Amino acid sequence: MKIFFFIFAALILLAQIFQARTAIHRALICKRMEGHCEAECLTFEVKIGGCRAELAPFCCKNRKKH
């Protein structure tokens, strides 16, 4: 019975590690697109994707003036 709880706890930890890795990867993609991760984009910015982090879900970039 103890081994069941140990395996269950290990699976929960692994799930959290993979989520963190994905969030870091998305933040790097946002940086490559010359954006930044924010909780909300400002009025003069456009949403170009998602960072999927808890505190900064949006990838924002300044609008280009034509």
UniProtKB/Swiss-Prot annotation:
InterPro entries: Beta_defensin_dom (IPR025933). GO terms for biological process: defense response to bacterium; innate immune response. It is found in: Secreted. It holds the Pfam family Defensin_beta_2. Transmembrane segments: none annotated. The keyword Disulfide bond applies. The keyword Disulfide bond applies. It comes from the Eukaryota. GO terms for cellular component: extracellular region. Keywords: Antibiotic, Antimicrobial, Defensin, Disulfide bond, Secreted, Signal. Residues 1-22 form the signal peptide. Disulfide bonds join C37-C51, C41-C60. Belongs to the beta-defensin family. Has antibacterial activity. This is Beta-defensin 107A.
